[in-house]
Structure formats: C-alpha cells, structure tokens
Amino acid sequence: MLFVETQDIKPGMRLAKPVYNRNGVLLFDRNTKLTVQNIVNLTNFGLIGIFILEPAEPLPPISREEQEFEQLQTFYMFRLRDNLVNISKGKMPADLSGLAKDVTDRFGTLDHKVHFTQTIRSNTDFVYKHSVGVAIISAMIGHAMGLRESTLLSIVNAAFLYDFGYLYVPAEIMKKGEDITDIENTTITKYREKAFA
C-alpha cells in the first residue's frame, strides 16, 4: 500500500482504502480501479492524496469494524470542521457537545484496539482529522483509566480544540510543512496562543 498525491494518480491504479463524503456515504470502494473521471472526481473532492495498492498487491482483508471506523472518522472530521469554522467566525459551535458525546459513547467504552490510518484532503484537514484521532484515543485511554463520563466528555472536547489555532495560520506557512523558518514558527505559536485568548 502506498500513499500517492493527487497530482500523481494515474488511471488503472487501485484504491487501497475507501473514500467517503462528508456524510459518511461511500464514494469509491476499496479495490476500485481508477479511471480518468474517477481521478477528476477525487481531485474535485479536495483530496491531497490517496492510498493505492501496488500493481500485484492483493486487497488486504478489512473487518466490518475497520470499515465503519474509516467511515466514522470522515463523518466526525466534517462535523468537527463545521463546529470549528463557526467558532473561528465568533459563532457558537453547532453541535460540538453532541460530537463529543458520540465519540465518548462509541470509543469511550471499547476494550480493544482500533487501526488508525488517515487520508488527508488538505493542509487544514490535518487539524480536523488529527483532532478527531486525538479525541478518539483520549476517549479510549480515559475509559481504560476508569474516568467518569463527564470527565471523558471534557477531555474529548479539549482534544477537539487543542489545535484550533492552526486554522488561523496563513495557508502559505501551513503548506511548507516542516520547512518553516524560525520567524514562521514564532508566527504559528502566536496564532495558536491567540486562538485561546
């Protein structure tokens, strides 16, 4: 399995992971052999890359639970994005507490591992997907520690919000990844601190 950036996707490549829309509806299933039109659709959907299977690689098995987890991650990511966009505009979040409750109910009671891999659509998606992943792991760790539900909800909400300041960082800095200057790093720190002021 390889991660291939959108501009490098070629017809005939096969998807290793399913692609879902914001509502968790399946757009492309695993093992889909990509056509030119599929690639246009993936590009229009805003993906920065996808996981593909190597030419001779068999489709790896995936459990129903792993499939649901992939779907939920995408659904949660878009819900979180809607909430954080509202907050960044000075509005109340639409359903951040509902999202925290969903994550806590679903993952704050698990007694087994889950497999994390993420398909990031854009540099800002990093914030949303990463925050959702941290929230899920926090709910699982909190459950293992025997924390009360009210405490789990607080921890999950904190996980959703802790990287919020990255949304204010100028796009040209975010696109640089690790190739940032000391001045740009200071700028990022200021935006992250500003988010909590």
What is each stretch, according to the model?
Residues 1-100:
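Terminal helices and disordered tails flanking the catalytic cores of nucleotide-processing hydrolases
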Residues 55-189, 193-197:
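Acidic/His-rich, divalent-metal-binding segments that scaffold phosphate/diphosphate chemistry
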